[in-house]
Amino acid sequence: MNNNLLSVLITFLLSTVIYSLANPATITYSVQLYDQFSGYNNNFQTNVTGARVTGLVKSTLNSTTRVPELVSTSNGGLNDAGHILNPSLFQYFFSPQINSSLPAENNPYSFDLVFTYDKNRNTYVYNNEDFFPIDRKGFDIDPEKRINLNGATYHNYHFCMKINSAFTYQGSEYFNFQTDHEVWAFINNKLVIDLGGIHGPIAERINTKTLGLTIGRIYNFDLFFCNRQTVGSKLKIEIDITYSCPFRDFCGVCLGDGSSCAGGRIK
């Protein structure tokens, strides 16, 4: 083998290795799910149609709990528009409440959300037209609690999802979201996507160039998704970030607090 051919071969092999290291076929977010039951939290299955409502949650994420908080804890106003019938129970959308003697009991689980690399767009995508990760789990283990159907179609329609993570800012990252349910997203603890209320499919895009971030720094990325109504559950997320996780809890959840171990890990 001549030197030129050997050089070409080595260059090809090195580029292949570097490419594969830089762009793994999949990346996995270990997320926290909270199974909800409308009989315990009446903010679920309010039996209404509505529209997108912005301004339901505070524009700055609570740095201690790392979950959204309502702007108002009173009935009426935006809470009525967003079909938050009991504001005091909103805190348990994305936090565990496993005491059956108290209101808003839920079932926390951990779940792996696997993103697939799209080489044509150089992004990672999670796309699920029927995002029902806890069918016949949680409260729905009991057939008597499968009370909210879409006609004759069964799913466990009532659950919320929380992703607490971080990324190293490279200077041009973006996020695309498509969903027919509530989504709130925060970068650097600031609200960047505000899709509250009971609404139909909506697409949103975050361009991080507009957020005043510094290249090379690590920033928190927190995403909250909640399905409160029957019919469907669509979720598409497209990202092009360098994902990092400062620490994982003993459930394997990034920045978790161990609470999702109560219900176990969903395969």
UniProtKB/Swiss-Prot annotation:
GO annotation, cellular component aspect: extracellular region
InterPro entries cross-referenced by the UniProt entry: Fibro_Slime, PA14/GLEYA, PA14_dom, Prespore-cell_inducing_factor
Chief subcellular location: secreted
Q: Which Pfam families match?
A: PA14 (PF07691)
Task: Please give the residues the UniProt entry marks as glycosylated.
Answer: 47, 62, 99
> Could you tell me the keywords of this UniProt record?
Glycoprotein, Secreted, Signal
Instruction: Note the superkingdom of the native organism.
Output: Eukaryota
Its localization reads:
Secreted
Q: Specify the signal sequence span.
A: 1-22
**What residues does the PA14 domain cover?**
116-257
The protein's matches in NCBIfam families, at most eight in alphabetical order, are given as: Fibro_Slime
Q: Which PANTHER family match?
A: PROTEIN PSIB-RELATED, PROTEIN PSIB-RELATED-RELATED
Which family, according to UniProt? Belongs to the prespore-cell-inducing factor family.
Q: What is this protein called?
A: Protein psiS
**What is the scientific name of the source organism?**
Dictyostelium discoideum
